[in-house]
Structures are given as structure tokens and as C-alpha cells.
């Protein structure tokens, strides 16, 4: 095989450019779908019904989920994954900070709404999600090339369409002050979601502030400014540390939603200790309904 020199690749690059320049009328169907079919309301709903018509996880978009350490980012990821799977999502979890075993222990609890889910339910749950949930079984760190290859492989072989990457700082070769590398990662992720028609959630940490009570916004994310500029959406998770047990435990914020009208908002959430689910006011934890047919599938 010939070496892939710039000269050899040049004709293909020109073809790609030709296909990238398209007349406005070629997009007519997509615009009609938006206005007539309600295409703007596509995507996976989040666990809180109040956001149903305000914001969803849509194909072709990427989301940054931010917060300080121990704010509940991984907890929220699991809850999002669980709710998305009930809507037909196929999820790939790339958690370099939490093993598949640990994630499933938590998911059993969240889906059963019980602090100690029984074994029968757990076995049914694992059978139910066998073609809905996949793990990139690696801990520690990986480089961006390996991450991208794994994502493309999972989409090609398993049809995954919701990818959760926890977190930015576990991608090897990226330092806190290496803004150029951070920008490269988020740009590649943004390109991938459009190319592959999937949704990627990337977890990032907030800058260390003088007080854990300081309110976060999208400018609080640690690292290059391009992180929040390049992504389509920014979601924030912040513990409130209130003294009154009746006050909310967490504030969940839609801090940026590029393709949604007036979606930015703050949502108060309360922790249900038994299930480890975060619930909006007057919302109840709902057990996932499973039956023996899932074992036979």
C-alpha cells in the first residue's frame, strides 16, 4: 500500500470540499421537518419532566457537563443514561474514573429505587440493558485517538447513539493549563457528533473557587475558554450545602443551549437517599418495570 502522503490525499480532500458546498434548497426537507413535524423536539428527555419541552439530548450535538469535585456529575450521568435507555437510547459509557462494576452497582439502585435491590431485579436489569448499555472497559486514561476509535467502533458495531465521556482530564496528554490540547479534544468531539449523528456528553471540572457556595456558570469551567464555546450545550451540577433538610440538595443548570430557545434555567433538585436519584419538587422516584421476558430476549 502506498504511503498516505499529502499529494495522495489531495484529490480526496477536494472531493470532500465539493460535497460540503450545497445549495440552500437541498436542506428544504430538514427545515420542513423542523416546522411541520416538530423536529425541534427530538432527542432524549432528561430525568426531570419540567425540562421536556425546554431541552433534550439531540443527535448531532455535544454537551459539556460541569461541576466541582463530588458535586454529583457521575450520579447525574447514570440517571440520564437510565432515562435515555427507557426511550430507546443505546449508551456507551466511557468512564475512566469509575469501573463498569461500580457503575452497575449504582444503576441497580437507581433503577430499583431501593438501597438494597434484590438479586432477581438486578439480573432482570442486566438482561434488559444487554443491548442498550455498553462500557469502554478501561480505567486510568486513554489518548484521544483511542477514544475516537472506540466511539466509532461502538456506533458501527452496536448502534450506540449516546456517548458519555467521564472525564476530560482523563484523556492522556492533557494538562490543566494545556489549553491547546483541550481545544483540540473538544473540537474533535464536536466534529464527531455531526459526522456520526450521535450525542456526546463530556464531563469537565469547575475551577476551584474561594467557596463551594459560589454560584457556577459556564465561565466557571476549568480550562480553555473554547471548551464551552465549541460545545452546543453546557449543563452544570452544583451542591447547595443547605442547612435546612427541606431545602434542595443540588442545583442543576442549563447554562447554554445553542439550538434551543430560552432553555437556560436553574432547577432545584432533592436527593432521594434510597435510590440515589435527584428529583425535582413533587417528583417521585419511579422503579423501572421489568419482566421475565427480558431474561429470554
What residue spans do the PLM features occupy?
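Conserved inter-motif catalytic segment of the P-loop NTP-binding fold
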Residues: 2, 6-7, 29, 87-177, ...
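C-terminal regions of RecA-like/P-loop NTPase motor modules
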Residues: 3-10, 19-28, 144, 148-163, ...
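The Walker A/P-loop phosphate-binding site
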Residues: 11-113, 295-297
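Conserved catalytic network of the ASCE P-loop NTPase/AAA+ motor domain
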Residues: 56-58, 84-87, 126-128, 153-157, ...
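Cofactor-binding loop segments of dinucleotide-utilizing enzymes, especially the Rossmann-like FAD-
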Residues: 96, 205, 239
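Structural recognition of the conserved hydrophobic beta-strand(s) that form the central parallel beta-sheet
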Residues: 164-165, 198-205
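Short, solvent-exposed loop/turn segments at secondary-structure junctions
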Residues: 171-175, 207-214
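Charged helix-capping and loop-helix junction motifs
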Residues: 179-188, 217-221
Amino acid at each position: 500500500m502506498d504511503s498516505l502522503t499529502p499529494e495522495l490525499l489531495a484529490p480526496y480532500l477536494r472531493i470532500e470540499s465539493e460535497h460540503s458546498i450545497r445549495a440552500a434548497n437541498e436542506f428544504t426537507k430538514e427545515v420542513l421537518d423542523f416546522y411541520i413535524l416538530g423536529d425541534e423536539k427530538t432527542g432524549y428527555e432528561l430525568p426531570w419532566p419540567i425540562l421536556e419541552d425546554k431541552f433534550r439530548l439531540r443527535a448531532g450535538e455535544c454537551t459539556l457537563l460541569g461541576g466541582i469535585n463530588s458535586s454529583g456529575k457521575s450520579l447525574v450521568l447514570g440517571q440520564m443514561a437510565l432515562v435515555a435507555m427507557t426511550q430507546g437510547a443505546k449508551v456507551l459509557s466511557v468512564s475512566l474514573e469509575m469501573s463498569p462494576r461500580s457503575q452497575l452497582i449504582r444503576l441497580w439502585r437507581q433503577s430499583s429505587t431501593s438501597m438494597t435491590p434484590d438479586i432477581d431485579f438486578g439480573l432482570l436489569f442486566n438482561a434488559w440493558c444487554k443491548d442498550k448499555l455498553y462500557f469502554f472497559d478501561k480505567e486510568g486514561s486513554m489518548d484521544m485517538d483511542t477514544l475516537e476509535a472506540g466511539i466509532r467502533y461502538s456506533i458501527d458495531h452496536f448502534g450506540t447513539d449516546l456517548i458519555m465521556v467521564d472525564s476530560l482530564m482523563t484523556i492522556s496528554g492533557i494538562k490543566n493549563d494545556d489549553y491547546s490540547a483541550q481545544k483540540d479534544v473538544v473540537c474533535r468531539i464536536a466534529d464527531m457528533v455531526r459526522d456520526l449523528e450521535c450525542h456526546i456528553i463530556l464531563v469537565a471540572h469547575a475551577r476551584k473557587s474561594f467557596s463551594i457556595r459560589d454560584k457556577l456558570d459556564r465561565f466557571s469551567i476549568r480550562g480553555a475558554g473554547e471548551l464551552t464555546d465549541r460545545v452546543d450545550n453546557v449543563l452544570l451540577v452544583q451542591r447547595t450545602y443547605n442547612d435546612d433538610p427541606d431545602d434542595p440538595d443540588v442545583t442543576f443548570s442549563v447554562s447554554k443551549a445553542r439550538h434551543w430557545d430560552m432553555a437556560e434555567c436553574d432547577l432545584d433538585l432533592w436527593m432521594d437517599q434510597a435510590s440515589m436519584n435527584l428529583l425535582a419538587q413533587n417528583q417521585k422516584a419511579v422503579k423501572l418495570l421489568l419482566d421475565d421476558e427480558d431474561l429470554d430476549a
